[in-house]
Structures are given as C-alpha cells and as structure tokens.
Amino acid sequence: MTGDERLAQVAPHMRQVRLQQLEFYAFVHFTVNTFTDKEWGDGTESPDIFAPTALDAEQWVTAVKSAGMRGLILTCKHHDGFCLWQSKLTKHTVAYSPYKNGGGDVVREVADACRKHGIEFGVYRSPWDRNCPLYGQGRAYDDFFIGQLTELLTNYGRIFAVWFDGACGEGTNGRKQYYDWDRYYDVIRKLQPDATIHVCGPDVRWCGNEAGHTRSSEWSVVPLRTRDTEKISENSQHTDSDEFRQRKISAWDEDLGSREILRNEPQLIWYPAEVNTSIRPGWFWHENENDSVKPLNELIRIYNS
C-alpha cells in the first residue's frame, strides 16, 4: 500500500459524519457570570445572584434556527461550578436560586425548546470546578464529575454533543485535578452513544484558538498524536485573558495534515476541526460590550475562511 493509499483508508465514524452534516451550531454561554459581570466566576458567588426575570428559551432557539443553525450547545456548568440544572450533587445550582422560586431548570427549558423546533441539543460541562471541595482529590472528584455528567446525559433526551475544554486550574484547596478522561468517555459512550465528544475528546478537535482563525488547509485526517488531552489542556485558557481570546494559531501547529506530514506518521485518525468563536469580545454578556458585537460581514468572513 502506498503512502497516499494509506491516507485514503482513514474514514470517519458515523457520529462524526452526522455532526459535520449539521455544519453550523450555536454555543450559548449563560450562568451566574451574566449577573456578576465576570467572564470567569470563582465559585464563591451566591446562587441568589442568579435571578433572570425574562428568560425565554424558545426565543433563543428560534433565533438560532432563523440563523440557519441546526444545533445548540449550552454551558450547563462553567468553571464556577454553578449548575443550570437541578443537580442533586451540589447546592451551587438553580435549585438554591430565586429563579422560579428554586424550581427552575434552564437545561430542561432549552432542551425542550430545541426538541420542539427541530434543533439538536448539546451540553458543555467544564472539567474544572472552582466550587466543589472534592476538586483535586482524584477519584472522589471523578465520581462527582461522572455523577453530574450522568444527570445531564439521562434526563434531557438525545444529546448530540458533549463539549469539554481543557481548563484545569486550582480548586478551593489549592490543588489541581488529574482528569480521568477515558472514564468520562466510557460513560458518554454508554449513555449517549451517538454524541460526539469535542475538544478534550476523541471525536472533534479544537482549531487552537477562540478568535476564529484556522489553517489555510484544515485537514480531517491528522496524526494520532494530535488527540493528546494533556497537550490540548496545556494550550487551553488557564486565566481570564483577552489576549488569549484573540490569539492566532501558533507556528508549531500550522501544518497538521499535509501529505508531507502524514507520510511520516505511524498512526492516523479522522479528527475534524471545530471553530468556536464568540460574537462578542468574551463569551458572556457584559453591558459595556454591547457596542463591540462582531458585525455580520466579519462573522461571514470567519465562517467562509
């Protein structure tokens, strides 16, 4: 078999095919940060701060659909640890907030609206938790993480995507957690076998930045070594930084999939890239940034580049 024939043998899994058929989907960021005016919460915020008065999940979803998007991924829990669903494993959740007198479930509202309007629903759950005292304690935190992951994957119908970033800062005890990624993946494959696992996952790789920059040729067949969660985490955002959000791809990873590169690689995989970029300077809503929303022509340029 020639080198080029070997490259042609690498094929996607059906879940990867289905994802790429979606083409375009929303990444919705909403949590306590929306009310504290922060990009990153630190886990000490009171659930009392979460008090939306006009949340309309159907409006979100119909806006997504009108833009031609076919899916929506919701930040069910960001680094602060606050859960937008009625988690039974923590008190840092909507159940202890004023929203609907503690009876609200934003994940339920958005999932139901997506289903009603024919939009695929996915979940983001940060591996970092700045509120949970178990973070940094190895298996104890992994058990907690899997417990919350199980809640999300068993109570809200079909999930098309599970999105993990590589955030791995310190917890309340000053320790970092070594994530048991393979164990997390096994749970997802068992509970939602059709879901793609993104970024710190085996199905979809990160393009390498949050500014919408990609390589001139973004190949789906790449070396197996690119699926290295430690390397992904190392290159992920570790502090709230505008500079990070605007950075371009670094020189060391400009070419991942040319024939010249792949012919010398012992193992190859189908690992398509995903571009995640915000329409605002950061990911969360801040009133003082309302005049800094990317114009339509810029968004179209990013999409087409």
Residue ranges, per PLM feature:
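Mature catalytic domains of secreted/periplasmic carbohydrate-active enzymes
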Residues: 1-305
